[in-house]
Amino acid sequence: RKSMTVGFLRTAALRKAYYHMTEPLFPQQKMFDVEPSQFPTFMNLLNVRARDIGLMEPGQIALVPQDPAVPNVGPFINMIEEYGRLTLEQVRTWETTFIGHNDRMSQNSKILFEALMRTLSVTGLQQIQVWKNQYMINGHDAGLCLLKVIIRESYLDSNATVSTICMN
């Protein structure tokens, strides 16, 4: 299978930017174990990275239509800041509209996926790998779906999002 990333990594500058965008969120010596105690830090670091690389700009992947079956029609829910308002099925329906295409949204999903995977410790990867069918779409890595699985598996114990996340 040909990597989606090849097309936009033709120059050294683009490769450097790509590797910066997909760096682990945590410092290398402190990876994310998918534990509740690390979750707020994980989400804060993800929020910073997502803003930095434009994932939360209008028309980008983190802004999920309330009805993902009708893409690009609002109102929109910010997946990174309001993750508890979306089910995995809504996220998957949204990501299916662009995953595997040769465009920025598909590339950003792949970038998010790689950054998240590089952030997980061995323990975190072991918890997440069993749900591979939930974060892969037609053989493609789906960044938002992976994020939703990570959130669910982190067993959040804060705020009112607990019941929503556990049910989804």
Where are these predicted regions, by residue range?
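Extended alpha-helical scaffold segments
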Residues: 1-12, 49, 114-115, 120, ...
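Hotspots on structured nucleic-acid-binding interfaces, especially in canonical RNA/DNA-binding domains
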Residues: 7-108
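Short, well-ordered secondary-structure elements
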Residues: 61-165
